[in-house]
Amino acid sequence: MRAARSLRIACACALAGLAGLAQAIEFRSVAAPSLLYDTPSDKGRRVLIAAPGTPVEVVVTLDKWIKVRDASGAITWIAQDGLSARRTLQVTAERAVVRSQPDEASPAVFEVVKNVILELAAPAADGWVQVRHAEGGTGYLRIGEVWGL
C-alpha cells in the first residue's frame, strides 16, 4: 500500500517537472522593414531585410535583441523594437484555397500563393485557421498550408 502511494507521488512529481520544461512557442511579426543580423549587434553582418508583417518564431531574447527563426528555418537576430505582437502567417503551400468555413467542401473565398502573408484572425482549431488578407478577404486555411502557428 505504501509502495503504491510512494510510486503515485513519484510519478506526479516527475510529470510536474516535465510540464515545467515545456514552453509555448512564441510568434511575432516584423513591425517595419528591419535588418536581420548574424549576431545580436548592429555591428554584426547584415543577413537580409525582413518585410513588414513577416512572421518569426522567437528563439531567445537578450536585452534589446531577439533571436528569431523564419519560415525557411533561418536563424537571425533582430532589434527588439523591430517586432510587433501582431500575429501573421506565411503561406507555405504552392497554392492554397481560402474557404468560407473550416471544411474542404465549403466555397472558396479567394486563393493565395506561396509566401503570401496573412493575418491570424482566430486561433487554429480542428486543423483549420481563420485568416485575413490585407485586402480584406477572410476565410479558413488548413494549418498545414501556413507557417507561424
Report the location of each language-model feature.
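Bacterial N-terminal signal peptides that target proteins for export
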Residues: 1-11
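Bacterial N-terminal signal peptides
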Residues: 10-20
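SH3-family beta-barrel domains
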Residues: 21-39, 46-52, 57-102, 107-117, ...
